[in-house]
A protein has these predicted regions:
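Conserved phosphate/pyrophosphate-binding and hydrolysis machinery centered on Walker-type P-loop NTPases
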Residues: 10-17, 266
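Basic amphipathic alpha-helical segments that dock to polyanions
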Residues: 16-32, 38
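Short, non-ligating residues that shape and space the ligands of small metal-coordination modules
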Residues: 298-299
Length: 334
């Protein structure tokens, strides 16, 4: 592993980084040598055995009640939407009925195999609160503001649709009593005024659909740049956010504390928006499809979406996104 200089640690992890590095040094995990802090290679274990890079808490184990064997696992952040009670879980072509999702230090989903044409699709309610803003970039005409910082994402799976194959025919909806879960992580987001949305040709009734579609497409394209997966990211789009009082699109890391993906997106926003605009524009569908603006993880059933509005918005953002300029750190203005 490369050494971590203290000045770089402060710029990435904040002013508390030196104290944390010193504490890790006292515990014998790190050593300080010329060039910065390094992993203590004399330790019996490597860092990959001690630290889960993709988050904390481990995966939720899925146990077949008939055999007692573990058939698979799902990440903590997606367990509520994949293995909630009465969900139909598909694993390697086999279908399982979820009997229960047990809470505790180790979360376990108990399932039994069934043969059924039924499928389930969870719906959720998500809210996001801005905790701090670390960097800001303003377009030269002041029409778009980009930010990077810390956010709290609160999500609750509220209900699920029961569907039938083929065609995923809707059968019924069932309410769920699932807990709210809050994730503190890193995000990047942009804001623009309703007047700007109107000026670039987006009808008032299509504003939310345009923002929502742009969010989906952006999340689908960022993994091509940031070396991650769509499931490593989350997002929220709204035509009036409580912390910005403006139409806003957020893209956040799906792991506690962040994993650097949203930070990368902020630093390379121009290329990110160019790639996203190109993907949406080149897709031959008319109203949107899984290739461009529909998301397999959308908690709102991919509604509302406006492909026309997304193309207008993304095309505008190509010329209103950070690229080679150095974004303004808020600490530089104090």
């Amino acid at each position: 592993e490369l050494p971590l200089p203290e000045d770089e640690a402060v710029s990435v992890f904040g002013s508390g980084a030196p104290a944390l590095l010193a504490e890790l040094g006292q515990e014998g995990l790190l050593v300080h040598r010329s060039g910065g802090w390094r992993w203590n290679v004399s330790s019996s274990d490597g860092p990959w055995e001690e630290i889960q890079i993709r988050g904390s808490g481990g995966d939720v184990q899925i146990v077949d009640t008939r055999s007692g064997s573990i058939i698979g696992s799902v990440p903590q952040d997606s367990a509520d939407s994949q293995v909630f009670p009465d969900a139909i879980y598909v694993h390697q072509g086999r279908t399982f009925h979820v009997l229960s999702l047990e809470e505790g230090p180790t979360r376990i989903a108990y399932v039994e195999e069934v043969r059924t044409p039924l499928r389930t699709r969870a719906q959720d309610a998500t809210s996001l609160r801005v905790i701090s803003v670390d960097e800001e970039w303003v377009s030269p005409d002041s029409l778009v503001h980009w930010y990077r910082g810390t956010v709290d994402v609160t999500r609750q799976v509220t209900d699920f649709d029961l569907l039938r194959l083929p065609g995923l025919e809707y059968i019924s909806n069932t309410q769920l009593d699932m807990p709210e879960r809050t994730l503190r992580t890193q995000a990047c987001w942009y804001t623009l005024s309703p007047a700007t949305m109107a000026a670039i040709g987006i009808d008032k009734g299509d504003v939310l659909g345009a923002l929502h579609a742009a969010e989906h497409a952006s999340i689908a394209l960022l993994p091509l740049l940031a070396n991650c997966d769509r499931w490593d990211l989350g997002g929220l789009s709204t035509n009036l956010h409580t912390d910005t009082d403006l139409p806003t699109v957020f893209v956040h890391d799906a792991y506690p504390g962040g994993a650097g993906y949203a930070h990368y997106g902020f630093a390379h926003a121009r290329e990110w928006m160019e790639r996203t605009y190109q993907a949406v524009s080149e897709c031959q569908c008319h109203d949107g499809c899984p290739r461009c603006i529909q998301s397999p993880k959308c908690g709102n059933g991919n509604e509302p979406l406006s492909k026309i509005g997304a193309k207008l918005l993304l095309g505008f953002l190509v010329e209103h996104s950070p690229f080679e300029e150095i974004p303004r750190k808020l600490s530089d203005t104090k």
